[in-house]
Amino acid sequence: MAIHTLLFVSLLIFSLIESSSGGKKDRLFTDLQNSIEVTAKPVKDSGVLEAGKDMVTITWKLKSSSAKVDTDTAFKTIQVKLCYAPISQVDRPWRKTDNKLFKDRSCPHEIVSKAYDKTPQSLDWTIGLDIPTGTYFVRAYGIDGDGHEVAYGQSTDEGRTTNLFSVHAISGHHVGLDIASTFFSVFSVVSLFVFFVMEKRKAKLEQRE
């Protein structure tokens, strides 16, 4: 009986998940209107940017040349993301581009998500410490009231080959970890020494008896 109940609950949860995500599964990137103008300019003049240190100035606004300038009336939120360029997707299926938005893995790093403002927006973004080494561009999505993407814009061309920038990730070497490692090493040595002294004292007491 318990097994049947568990199976029923599992199927119910699965069906609820499917129904809630069904709308997103039908949405294709090629159906979105390219009506947002996005730029991404590293503050550093040249060279590879360092994660956790260097900054990128990002701007976005509705394209004035858009055939449907009123498309922004559907926007409730603007979501800006950092996306992998094709060169950083080679042999990395977990970063693959897919026309089905719910399957697309090319833009996993959210930079900012905020209420839509019709006036041109700008952001000086410091590259996060969690950003891996790679080549990137920036993409912005216009999100409607139901949480669906209805428009987009990106800082590169359609082939994602221009206006790219490269990031070098931190090595993962932290002073805090070194201190912790040293502390535990010393603690282990001291503990071993104390254990040795106690055992030796115990042996002497046994000999006297």
Curated annotation (Swiss-Prot):
Q: Which InterPro entries match?
A: Transptr_NO3_Nar2 (IPR016605)
- Which Pfam families does this one have? NAR2
Q: In which tissues is it expressed?
A: Bearly detected in roots and shoots.
Primary subcellular site in the record, as a coarse category: membrane
Q: Does the keyword Membrane apply?
A: yes
| Compartments, record wording | Cell membrane
Asked if the keyword Cell inner membrane belongs to this entry, the reply reads: no
Q: Which residues cross the membrane?
A: 177-197
Q: One of this protein's GO BP terms?
A: nitrate assimilation
GO CC terms:
plasma membrane
Secretion signal: which residues? 1-22
Q: What induces it?
A: Not regulated by nitrate.
- From the Swiss-Prot or TrEMBL record, what is one GO molecular function term? nitrate transmembrane transporter activity
Q: Which UniProt keywords apply?
A: Cell membrane, Membrane, Nitrate assimilation, Signal, Transmembrane, Transmembrane helix
Q: Superkingdom, according to UniProt?
A: Eukaryota
How does this protein lie in the membrane? Single-pass membrane protein
What does the sequence similarity comment in the record state about its family? Belongs to the NAR2 family.
Outline what the protein does: Acts as a dual component transporter with NTR2.1. Required for high-affinity nitrate transport.
Q: What is this protein called?
A: High-affinity nitrate transporter 3.2
Species whose genome carries this gene: Arabidopsis thaliana
User: What gene is this protein a product of?
Assistant: NRT3.2
